UniProtKB/Swiss-Prot annotation:
Disulfide pattern: none
Gene Ontology MF: a single term: iron ion binding
Domain of life: Bacteria
Originating species: Mycobacterium tuberculosis (strain ATCC 25618 / H37Rv)
Gene Ontology cellular component list: plasma membrane
Name of the molecule in the record: Uncharacterized protein Rv3633
InterPro entries per record: Phytyl_CoA_dOase-like (IPR008775)
Family (UniProt): Belongs to the PhyH family.
Pfam families assigned: PhyH
Ranges in coiled-coil conformation: none
Length: 291
């Protein structure tokens, strides 16, 4: 099967069922490297702690995860693009990005990139869809398309994502009793990709080991990203990104004109110390600000 036909099949599965699985996105050595490095980040950085209703409880200081399991079931490191070239490779991965683009279009954006570590004993998440914050009639065109790369084998016992196939086409949110989800059991290194309208949940982790993963979420180019990467990633670092990654975090244009600076993409100004348009009108702007 050619790459284009494989991508077409995967995009078709997302359209029909709301999700698909891409096998062997990471090999065993890469899984081990990401797992070791994300553990290092959890030791060295403040971590986001959240409970299974997806309520963020706050930040834990480096190397310390509170033991009060009533308060939290998840540990996350946000904005992974700040933490090394291995993470820069994830949003542009050749097995992932073509599928995302097939769902959202070439003008899509990276919404966020983070670790998602479900702790032992975590209870199941509530049934939810990732685009429920948008006040739009359902079903609607795909607004979000998300990828989760397993850093261990995902099983029904350790918190494998449970999906309700076809629910991305439902006209309204479900009411209790909620439908039972189908566990998507995948191997370490595989990726689950789903339409943001798909109703799903992370099952309870009934084991004594964490269930680590990498999450790479995308949105169409005309909605707001969850993480403001234009401000949170230093420009000096963005200059080192490959051009496609620069576009994905917001330095490109949507439909050839949205997000522009002087009718040019923001990436054109990454190497400029000052914006040429501002140079031309600096005195006038300063006067206007004083007024």
């Amino acid at each position: 099967m050619t790459q284009s036909s494989s991508v077409e099949r995967l995009v078709g599965e997302i359209d029909e069922f709301g999700y698909t699985v891409v096998e062997d996105v990471l090999d065993a050595d890469s899984v081990a490297a990401y797992l070791a490095d994300t553990r290092r980040l959890e030791r060295e950085l403040p971590t986001v702690i959240a409970n299974s209703t997806t309520v963020v409880k706050g930040l834990a200081r480096p190397g310390h995860v509170p033991v009060d399991r009533v308060d939290h079931d998840w540990v996350r490191i946000d904005n992974l693009l700040l933490h090394g070239t291995r993470y820069e490779a994830l949003p542009v991965h050749p097995k992932l990005l073509p599928v995302i683009e097939g769902v959202l279009g070439r003008d899509c954006l990276l919404s966020w990139c983070m670790t998602s570590n479900q702790l032992p004993g975590a209870v199941a998440q509530r049934l939810h869809c990732d685009d429920e914050m948008y006040p739009l009639p359902r079903p609607h065109q795909p607004l979000l398309c998300n990828a989760l790369i397993a850093l261990c084998d995902f099983t029904a016992d350790n918190g494998a994502t449970q999906v309700v196939p076809g629910s991305h086409r439902w006209p309204e949110r479900p009411s209790p009793p909620y439908p039972e989800g189908k566990p998507v059991e995948i191997n370490a290194g595989d990726a689950l990709i789903w339409n943001g309208s798909l109703w799903h949940t992370a099952a309870a982790n009934r084991t004594d080991a964490p269930r680590p993963a990498l999450t790479i979420n995308f949105c169409v180019g005309f909605v707001r990203q969850q993480v403001n990467q234009q401000l949170s990633i230093p420009r000096e670092l963005v200059r080192c990104f490959e051009p496609r990654l620069q576009e994905l975090i917001g330095y490109g244009l949507y439909a050839g004109k949205m997000g522009r600076i002087d009718w040019r993409p923001p990436a054109d100004y990454l190497d400029a110390d000052r914006h040429p348009f501002l140079d031309a009108v600096a005195d006038r702007l300063q006067t206007s600000v004083r007024l």
